[in-house]
Amino acid sequence: MQIDHLDYQWAKTQDPKDVGKMATDIHASLHQAFSTDLSWSANAIDASLNNPYHHFFIMRDPANLEIVGLAHFQLIFDEVELFNIAILPDYRRQGLSYRLLEEALLYFAQNKGKIVTLEVRSRNQAARQLYEKLAFKQIASRPNYYPVDLDDAIIYQRNLVDKI
């Protein structure tokens, strides 16, 4: 599905009722994006939404307000960690992951973030290319980190002071 404009939302809210619905919506979007590899439960997402150190950046289709993409980060002091990024299958291959991460990195650079770290499966070439395009550098690996298929984890890092 082609998208020309998406609404960005920082997924923090003070209303507990909204947090629960947002957790359900985020879980449904993650499940749709990662139907075979979903390690985040709705309860874990709900807890993250209530955690002051966790930040969700949401992309919604303005036509139907459906969550079509999201990125989940943790910010502690000046260190940012990307836990998850997901784009629904029908919305992929349009540069939305790049746009979503670019917005989030700009936010963190303006809000005391100095360095971003993430982990990705070594076989996930599309994600690795995305991170490298956004100036992330590989700094380490964890051999056989993922128990199901013994894939390696690749650790990337980016200094937010650097320009893309």
Region locations from a protein language model:
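Acetyl-CoA-dependent GNAT
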Residues: Q2-D90, L101-E103, Y107, N159-K163
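Conserved acetyl-CoA-binding loop-helix of GNAT-fold acetyltransferases
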Residues: I87, R93-L106, Q110, R128-K133
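Residue-level recognition of the GNAT/N-acetyltransferase active site
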Residues: L88, R92, E119-R123
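Short glycine/proline-centered loop/turn elements that form peptide/ligand docking sites
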Residues: S97, L101, R123-A127, N144-D149
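Conserved GNAT acetyl-CoA-binding A-motif
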Residues: F108-E119
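Conserved catalytic-core motifs of GNAT/GCN5-like acyltransferases
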Residues: E119-V120, E132-A153
